[in-house]
């Protein structure tokens, strides 16, 4: 996923989930935050951030959208739409080794009472396999270990359990955690934050759902799905 034009700024404060105050070229601006999660460990007053410049769109309420933040020397993308886009591109370009011989890939497909991020079809040795992928973006990191979620997510738990049902019905089910940074070498479930979600993922992994974690290469104007990262399911 590539951004058209990106500028730098200094984060000042976040009045609510949707907007932030950022200093850009010496002027304080109200900007859109492309992530409604808490991100408290990232959005600390004074940190450097990157913003997508949207001034060429006259219909926008704000001129900029906050997309990335530096945590020390590590650049973390926090755009909640980016993991889905990066995964879609990587799968389409056959860069995800777990999904090969792709014949069809589609976004936002309904199954049961849920809408999964991606639907795909593969053809191996004449056998057609249909499947769903649910993508979760990961921004919470501590000492090289990433965790999800950073806030309770009933909706996320529902998606995971629906994926188990899809597998029971013969579909291939994949839960893909996209770590929106490069560097961490382990992904863990955040049992302390959301035990129900963590239990659901553990249950899913034991009942046919493929749980994957990939890091990402983060450039100032781009996010590219990277390498597979080990998963620790333990509480």
Swiss-Prot record:
GO molecular function: DNA binding
Pfam families per UniProt: SfsA (PF03749), SfsA_N (PF17746)
InterPro entries: SfsA, SfsA_C, SfsA_N
Tree of life domain: Bacteria
Disulfide bridges in this chain: none
Family: Belongs to the SfsA family.
PANTHER family for the chain: SUGAR FERMENTATION STIMULATION PROTEIN A
Name recorded for this polypeptide: Sugar fermentation stimulation protein homolog
Biological classification of the source: Bacteria, Bacillati, Bacillota, Clostridia, Peptostreptococcales
